Curated annotation (Swiss-Prot):
HAMAP family: GpsB. One of its GO terms (cellular component) is cytoplasm. The gene is gpsB. Residues 68-86 have a biased composition (Low complexity). This is Cell cycle protein GpsB.
Amino acid sequence: MASIIFTAKDIFDQDFKREVRGYSKSEVDEFLDDIIKDYETYAALVKELREENRRLKEELAAKPVEKAPVQPTQPVQSTQATQSTVESFSQMTSATNFDILKRLNRLEKEVFGKQILDRE
């Protein structure tokens, strides 16, 4: 985080060298007056926010930790429907696995059976 280089007082007390073809002194003064006002506003805002931050931290530290009650995600009535769905899915999976094993066995017989015949 960048630090603030000038305070409102530093800007107010700054003197510029005067030259023949220099800037308009009144214009520079008006501009610097606006900058000073901005700095004062920023300083007040930072002070206010720091105070609010401190107050909120104190409130948070003083507040006891509350745990939210755990609620079931599904109603009890739908649990039986879910169990029957799981059972039917596992039956489909085992049937699918059995079909895959049969196909694999048949392919192995074709591939390795030919290799055994070729060796003889």
